[in-house]
Amino acid sequence: MVLSSDIDLLNPPAELEKTKHKRKRLVQSPNSFFMDVKCQGCFNITTVFSHSQTVVMCGSCSSVLCTPTGWPRRLTEGCSFRRKSD
């Protein structure tokens, strides 16, 4: 007998999988990712790791792009980012 409130364990919903710990998911995957950060002054794009532990500076104008505060990184006001595709 199948109830409507049952969850299919082989095909769980994506929302449910995102809330689980990275090792408890059906297919293990990391929470970290690389992202492209655009500088607010010179519009130069820099690739940054989401969990990096150092301050990231712009290569051309030396302004601070991100500061380490845990996850997610704190971007400087005015900077924009996008997640890099696999």
Curated annotation (Swiss-Prot):
Cofactor or coenzyme needed: Zn(2+)
Species: Chlamydomonas reinhardtii
Entry-linked InterPro entries: Ribosomal_eS27, Ribosomal_eS27_Zn-bd_dom_sf, Ribosomal_zn-bd
Protein name: Small ribosomal subunit protein eS27
C4-type zinc finger span: 39-61
GO CC field: ribonucleoprotein complex; ribosome
Top-level division of the source organism's lineage: Eukaryota
Note describing how the cofactor binds: Binds 1 zinc ion per subunit.
Gene Ontology terms: biological process: translation
MF (Gene Ontology): structural constituent of ribosome; zinc ion binding
UniProt keyword terms in alphabetical order: Metal-binding, Ribonucleoprotein, Ribosomal protein, Zinc, Zinc-finger
Similarity comment: family membership: Belongs to the eukaryotic ribosomal protein eS27 family.
Gene name in the database record: RPS27
